[in-house]
Amino acid sequence: SIDNIFNNHGISDGKRAEFILRSFIQHKFNIDDITFAELYKLTNKNLLIIGTNFTHAREEVFSHTNTPDMSVITAVRISMSIPVFFTPVLYNNCYYVDGSIKNNFPIKYCNKYTTIGLYVRNNNDTCNNEISSIVSIILGCANIIADTINHKDIHLCDTIIQIDNYKHEMVNFDFTIDTKMKLLKLGHKYAKKFIKDLPRKICIAIINKIIDDVCNFI
């Protein structure tokens, strides 16, 4: 409720999302919760989840190496905690919120030679932020900040499929089937363009690598 914003600093406490996550884990592993260390042992997959430490204003990475005993559900709950919409998460005496506040496109943690990044970008050319409430101001600022962060890190990987002309709000959770199909078609369009341009991208990447090696040798 709106009263929850003033009492607990967010509209939703995220309990429903946690219930859904627990159901998935119960169905997959027949347990109610799972730590990063347990997940890695069972799957041999290195899961990284980004959160923002609001208390100390820094980006943190949750994984089986950094936080082996942390609940994966807690990490996911942190990563989805959009300010105002969800209450912050108290973990290790610090408050945490959505990782996108500090890094909305954490491609830097991936192998840039083997990772394909999908970057769904709002079209700022058609952006028309309006102020109708305190929430609209917060969301507008969050979108601007996130777009700036994205541009800062996007050069770190040559294999990024950038999907432009996306015109939906980041907190629009009520997607219709028609909207989902339009987004899929948009992704297919830009994926084909990416594949067509890939040989040129690879050549440029190789040339840049050679230049870097020569400069380092000199």
Could you describe each region identified by the protein language model?
Residues 1-218:
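Patatin-like phospholipase
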